Structure formats: structure tokens, C-alpha cells
């Protein structure tokens, strides 16, 4: 569920390169134009007073491509960024960062549809695993599943609290056969495994303690 492969790519800011297009009275790039930058990146779209501003497409030499809105040379507004690893982000940008609502499609086909802040999953969102169809719907904090959420699996779903991507505390399993199992997740004492010198290997184990089975709540 990591954002591996989502590193942003620096657009060339200081080097003007070659330009063909409209200019204003001051000689600045203004209107529609195309630029070929020294290291091989290209931009085609709108300029305002020498800055990328409005709709445009920026193609990176490494194969990444952004098509969407710009403001003061930064990705800002609605746009799509295609990454070299095959992943894609489509949604809102603020000051060159994924922020607001957007959909990220990962190289393995997994998707995250929800809120972002400073490039990270943050707020309400749904992560869907392409291979199994399982989903997490709920709250995210700085990229992790936190607070109230629902983990949906084949034939059942779990609703409860999450801490650092794991269920924690009271919750319930809801089964398609028409019943609910209420209980609590707690963390067992960590086991210290073998380690070299002063390193310590700690494995975290979660245990579900069932308390009651009821019919489906309305």
C-alpha cells in the first residue's frame, strides 16, 4: 500500500531553453507556446508573464507526463500525472503537491480514491486491492489507516478503530450470513527475536477477543 514510485520530478525552472510561441510586450512568454528545455523536458501550453499558467502538458525526460492546470510554474488545480512505473494520479494539486481529492492508481492495479494532503493519503478515502477486491474505507492520517474505518473482505467486513494500519480496540465483524461478532483487538507483548549485537527484532502480533454474537444491527 506504499506510495513507492510516486517521487515528484523537478521541472526545470532556471533554464529557459528553446521557446516557440506568444510573448507579451515585455518579451516574456505569454499565451500559448512550446518550450524544449536543456535536459530534454518539454512543455506545451499556456504561459502568463513568463510562467507556466493555465492548461498545459509537461513531459519529463524520464517518461513521466503531467497534463493539467498550472499556476506560477507549479502544478495547481486539476491534473493528471503519469509516472514512469505505470502508476497514475488524477485529481487536485496545490503548489505542486497532491492535495484535495484525487485517485491514485498503483503499478499493481490497486487504487486509492480519496483525500490527500502534502502528497500523502490524509482524510477520508477508499483503498482497493485489485487482486482480491478487498477494501479499506475510512480515515487516513499522514498515509496510514487511522481512527474509524471499515475493512471489507469477501463474505464479511470489519468495522472499528485503526492505529498505524492495524485494527485496535473494540470493533465488530459483520458476516453476510446475517450476524455480527463483537469483540476487541489487542496487541500481544512483543517477542524479541534474535539480532546481531545491540539490534533488537520486534514482531507485533494482534489478537482478536470475541465477546458476543448478535443479529445484524439496523
UniProtKB/Swiss-Prot annotation:
Region annotation Disordered: where it falls in the sequence: 1-48
Record's compositionally biased regions (Basic and acidic residues): 20-31
Main location: cytoplasm
UniProt entry keywords in alphabetical sequence: Cell projection, Cilium, Cytoplasm, Cytoskeleton, Developmental protein, Differentiation, Flagellum, Meiosis, Repeat, Spermatogenesis
Subcellular location per the Swiss-Prot or TrEMBL entry: Cytoplasm, Cytoskeleton, Cilium axoneme; Cytoplasm, Cytoskeleton, Flagellum basal body; Cytoplasm, Cytoskeleton, Flagellum axoneme
Keyword Acyltransferase: no
Cellular component GO terms held in the UniProt record: 9+2 motile cilium; nucleus; radial spoke head; sperm flagellum
BP-aspect Gene Ontology terms: axoneme assembly; meiotic cell cycle; spermatid development
UniProt cross-references to InterPro entries, sorted A to Z: MORN
Tissue expression: Testis-specific.
Start-end of each MORN repeat: 19-42, 43-65, 66-88, 89-111, 112-134, 158-180
Bias type Acidic residues, positions: 1-13
Record text on subunit structure and interactions: Component of the axonemal radial spoke complexes. Interacts with septin SEPT7.
Purpose: Functions as part of axonemal radial spoke complexes that play an important part in the motility of sperm and cilia.
Name assigned to this protein: Radial spoke head 1 homolog
Protein's organism: Cyprinus carpio (Common carp)
